[in-house]
Every structure is written in structure tokens, then in C-alpha cells.
A protein has these predicted regions:
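Extracellular/virion structural assembly segments
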Residues: 1-185
Length: 185
């Protein structure tokens, strides 16, 4: 993987082994889906509410009684990936008609959504040196807009962060969880 890129890999359950396995090659968000351009991702630095923490208060006490599970995990959190999908390279003039540009953008968009659906998505962000494991659950309804007369699709993809946090690029928590079929971490 090069620097300064957003990579996505899809994982599906292998029924024979019970492990999640890569479904094809790792793909670059901006290089492998036509003229898809990253806009933002929300929640990438968020951490979900900690599970396994219990508190009780009693009228006769000034403090809480607290139990913290030593192997506590976070609840999953939502992230929204925003991308702009163009029908041609937005940095170059195009000879395509508006209809052809929109059709090309729609084709690239459908290719991206087809990749995101039906599996778990390992997101690797070279800029932040972080990675996360997502699943696509919600409906997506892109809108059409234009910049300087160039039409594009403005797409917001709501993803669920399975672990409720991101990990450093060198961390193996996600890969180990995938190998164990979603059990343990």
C-alpha cells in the first residue's frame, strides 16, 4: 500500500473454515472506482461507549460502587463516508456530454457500492495511519450536484464500526478477529 491513500478490502465468511477471508484484492478508494474522490469520514477518531462498566449508587453512600470488566470492549459506532463520484477526471476538461458524465459517475458509484455490500470492510487510512472494520447496513441515496458545470454524485455511506474504535496500522486485532471468524480479539 502506498502513502496517502484510502484502501478498502472486503471480507466474507468462508463456510468451510468459519474464518473471514479476503474477497478479492485490496482496492484504493480513489484509484479503483472510476473517478471517486474522498470527501470525509465521520467518527473515525470516535470511540464507542465502554461496555462492561456497572455502577450503583446508594442513598447512604457518598460514592458510587463501580465494577469495570477487565476485558471491557466498546459498543459499535456509526461512521459516515462521504465521497464525490465524477464521470471523468475532474482536474481535466471533458468532451463527454452531461448525460455521459452522469452515466459514467453512476457506473462507478454502483461498482463501489457493490464492493461495500455483502461483506465486512477493512478500511485502511494511510493519512491517519489507522484502520477500522465496517459493515454497510443502511440505505444509500446519492444526490446529483455540479462543480463548475461538472456533474457529480454526492454520496454519503453510513457504516457501522464493528469494534467501536480504530486501530493503528500495525495493530493485528482486526486481522486476528477475522481469522477467528469474528470470535475473540
Amino acid at each position: 500500500m502506498g502513502t496517502g491513500k484510502f484502501h478498502i478490502a472486503r471480507y466474507v465468511m468462508d463456510e468451510a473454515t468459519g474464518a473471514y477471508v479476503a474477497d478479492g484484492a485490496v482496492r484504493s478508494l480513489e484509484d479503483d472506482f472510476g473517478f471517486c474522490r474522498y470527501k470525509s469520514i465521520t467518527g473515525i477518531n470516535a470511540i464507542g461507549k465502554q461496555k462492561g462498566v456497572y455502577t450503583e449508587s446508594y442513598p447512604e453512600s457518598d460514592s458510587l460502587r463501580v465494577y469495570v470488566d477487565p476485558s471491557a470492549r466498546q459498543e459499535s459506532i456509526s461512521s459516515t463516508l462521504s465521497v464525490c463520484v465524477f464521470g471523468s477526471d475532474p482536474s481535466l476538461p471533458s468532451t463527454l456530454s452531461t448525460e455521459e458524465l452522469v452515466k459514467s459517475a453512476e457506473d462507478s458509484w454502483h461498482e463501489l457500492v457493490g464492493f461495500l455490500r455483502g461483506g465486512l470492510i477493512l478500511w485502511t487510512d494511510d493519512y491517519r495511519q489507522r484502520k477500522a472494520l465496517f459493515v454497510l447496513q443502511d440505505a444509500i441515496d446519492p444526490t446529483t450536484d455540479s462543480i463548475k458545470g461538472l456533474p457529480y454524485l454526492d454520496c454519503k455511506v453510513k457504516l457501522q464500526n464493528i469494534f467501536g474504535e480504530t486501530f493503528g496500522s500495525a495493530d493485528e486485532t482486526i486481522e486476528n478477529w477475522l481469522k477467528l471468524g469474528g470470535k475473540g480479539a
